Amino acid sequence: MVVIIPLALQSIVLVRGLNADHGIFYALICVFAAWVPDAGAFFAGKLFGKHKLCPIISPKKTVEGLIGGIISNVIVMQLLGWVFSEIVYDGTRQASVLSLLVIGLFGALVSTLGDLSFSLIKRSCKIKDFGNVIPGHGGVLDRFDSVIFTAPFVYLVASLLPIVP
């Protein structure tokens, strides 16, 4: 973990370097693609959650929450593309709908995989949180577990399908 975490987070720096003019936008996508599905899954799970996703690893996660996380991520990725295109660049630059769709759909799954992976590590170590730096949220690693998986994924997608062609 000592090597994997910094290498994975380095993807945020690498994704920023893919496009000199829009690197900050790319880096923000890394974070949003990880945190939006988490929030969407939380609210969808609270409202509609009936079927447990991985009860042994993370008992509160539901299939309905995962679906809500995917839907919310797709919507927010497209909204970010629209904000970038229409508000930041006044319609002169267009974000790739396809690239953001792929990041929205599969980024939510990768984000959930990251969250579940770190939950499994915590369960095997018999700890609830990786720290108590952020009240109610545990440690910094608890907030960035999904980013650690999502950032390399966004880098891969943005390398193959540029977010801003």
What are these regions (language model features)?
Residues 19, 101-102, 117, 123, ...:
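Short leucine-rich amphipathic alpha-helices used at interfaces
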Residues 1-105:
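Membrane-embedded alpha-helical bundles of polytopic integral membrane proteins
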Residues 7, 136, 151-153, 163:
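Hydrophobic residues in alpha-helical membrane-spanning segments
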Residues 49, 76, 126, 153-156:
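Single-residue recognition of alpha-helix boundary sites
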Residues 34-50, 54-55, 63-64, 109-149:
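Acidic (Asp/Glu-rich) catalytic motifs at the cytosolic membrane interface
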Residues 82, 156-165:
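Juxtamembrane boundary at the C-terminal end of a transmembrane helix
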Residues 89-95, 137-139, 144, 163-164:
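Short, conserved aromatic-histidine micro-motifs
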Residues 73-74, 143, 150, 159:
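Hydrophobic transmembrane alpha-helices of multi-pass small-molecule transporters
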